[in-house]
């Protein structure tokens, strides 16, 4: 089971970040529109979840299911267990989830540009009606801070909590229905 350690960097200049990553020698991954549906039991209580389950579809027809454990906040980053695997037929899995008593409670769409550099993964995410942000995944909080300095982002605002809280608390938008 993999652990992710990540932080979100807010208030970024998207073109400047892309340029800096390419100058460092980062590998750019093709851009995608992601469509994400979240599932849980009907009696879920927001903020009390012990795990999260989603089906994510990429614009290139790749689909995956992800189970995530509740995150631990590590200063400016967060850590959580995560299991991902590819699925060929997301509609059938969605039907299966509903048959075993789960319900779809949220839907998002976002555009993503990703890069890989050494041991880091970078995702520039753009949701509708809000500024883009950069998510950095690394081996530790210090590892993430190291690359923030390389990118000259160490003075930017960071966010360690989940995207739902970011979207609802900072941008006052409905995370449950983020559609283009």
Residue ranges and their predicted role:
Residues 145-156:
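Long, well-ordered alpha-helical scaffolding segments within enzyme catalytic domains
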Residues 125-129:
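A contiguous pocket-lining binding segment that forms or flanks enzyme active sites
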